[in-house]
Amino acid sequence: MRDTAFRSIKAKAQAKRRSLWIAAGAVPTAIALTMSLAPMASAQSSNLSSDAVVGSIAQGVTDGLTDYLKPRVEELPAGEVTYPEIAGLPDGVRVISAEWATSKHVILTIQSAAMPERPIKVQLLLPRDWYSSPNREFPEIWALDGLRAIEEQSGWTIETNIEQYYADKNAIVVLPIGGESSFYSDWEEPNNGKNYQWETFLTQELAPILDKGFRSNTDRAITGISMGGTAAVNIATHHPDMFKFVGSFSGYLDTTSAGMPIAISAALADAGGYDANAMWGPVGSERWQENDPKSNVDKLKGKTIYVSSGNGADDFGKEDSVAIGPANATGVGLEVISRMTSQTFVDRANQAGVEVVASFRPSGVHSWEYWQFEMTQAFPHIANALGMSTEDRGVECAPVGAIADAVADGAMGTCLTNEYDVTGGKAQDFANGRAYWSANTGAFGLVGRINARYSELGGPDSWLGYPTSSELKTPDGRGRFVTFEHGSIYWTATTGPWEIPGDMLAAWGTQDYEKGSLGYPTGAAVEYNGGLRQQFEGGYVFRTSNNQSYWVRGEISKKYADDGIFAQLGFPTGNEKLINGGAFQEFEKGNIYWSVSTGAHVILHGDIFDAWGAKGWEQGEYGFPTSDQTAITAGGQTIDFQNGTIRQVNGRIEESR
């Protein structure tokens, strides 16, 4: 595939010749496709017009033939979840959570007022200098999905290298998830279990979230593939003040000419069983005109417009081709429709005096590898429209000094920045993570979820300080960890990454770290009654209010976690102790005793405890407790044991066996 982009306003003289080429080249291609997909159509007419071609192709895609466009179902990697509180959003709109797949890839879950039935997810790829320039704002580049959008993640991150391509660029890449067959439009009525109001969500709800919560400078580009290309142009014409650039990669930029409503209706029926009448009402209605890109092209005057399409010719195996396999027959036909409608749009733009960068290729079909190519070809135009500096469009960089030594094995990937100052040291961003250096610790590179968690906590500015190791494998082989000046972060695929303060790490270490009965941490250390509490798979580690750290495990930890027990017992004053027949643990105001036959029970310091002790504690006459110590209505306390009961009534001890 060669770059054949041209400025349409400078090529009006060629418009007639192009139209003839389309008629002579693209239409026969479509006719050939129609013969294979819809043989009945050719029997009905021996002289097919371009309108008939479109209708015939549409007939051919109503039996699941667009399934090939559906991205592979891939779950996003589980990451640390945060809960941003963003002020000033429209009523009924909030960010429920932000999940950090990596330190530069965040998945927002949003409560929408326009589509309140279920949360909406949006992926953000953060700018190169997001961390090194924490007070800076950045432009947005929106990339809309196609007809077969799935709910797990954007097709862009599954099928293209968009994440890697933009890693060294200073823009926020915005990737809505879902929207199958929606055209990212506000639908007239609910259909097929969905109440699509995508345009309102994107322009009135998502945009303020990015502005107020993710450091947007409100300069925006909107792009899309196939259905998303149509949507990108429509949204830009409806909201011209929001976007400086609009790009369509194989979009359908004429929705109302004869044959196109049939094609769109067929596509929606094929991709999920949707009714096009529920989207824009009856064919020919005002809503169809409002969502016809060619009819509204004049509203884009003064913006940078990029339109691209192949011509349906399969170029797999040819020199300079980006194709990764032979063309799908349906993909040939869909690209022909895209080419014809995009040409109509460009011709209408020429008539209106609206300049378009038209990239009509001499080959190419309706497939993701071509759209990845167009993404890279469109970027210089996007960057110009958004006023991005040369430095913000990519970087020339190299690691030096200690950081260069730390990343010499290549695991960190290519650099995205040069070394920059952070509190007390240096940092440098790489494709796969970030390297840190301080005079006290030396240089270490961090990757993956541990690096993302460290970044979320504040990196070197956090209480952890600088890393003192690279990522290491845990002895049990199940997880990974990194040591820091004041603690560690441990990760497994099931628990995620969690930081452990140094003193609590030492207490955990007395149980042989992750190999012991406590297992891995399952959450962060949180404030708890003047101290800290951190949950593990098999119990807890506590930092008491006087800065002592102890662990509580197993059935004793479950009892201690019951409502109201902390108020009775206070913090632990030591770790669990094994005794004949069971175990016990001492707390500020009492103990918890456990045995296999009795379970775990609470006894408080005081007269009952002393009376039981006088009879030999759990090894004596009464044995282990079989109930918690509780208050009695007569005024006093009572507790049952294996061999009796001890009560305190009005200050007097009563024993019964």
Curated annotation (Swiss-Prot):
InterPro entries linked: AB_hydrolase_fold, Esterase-like, LGFP, Mycobacterial_A85_antigen
Matching Gene3D superfamilies: alpha/beta hydrolase
GO cellular component: extracellular region
Molecular function GO labels: acyltransferase activity, transferring groups other than amino-acyl groups
Keywords, alphabetical: Secreted, Signal
Subcellular location field: Secreted
A Pfam family of this chain: Esterase
Keyword Methyltransferase listed: no
Signal peptide extent: 1-43
Role summary: One of the two major secreted proteins.
Name the record gives this protein: Protein PS1
Gene of this entry: csp1
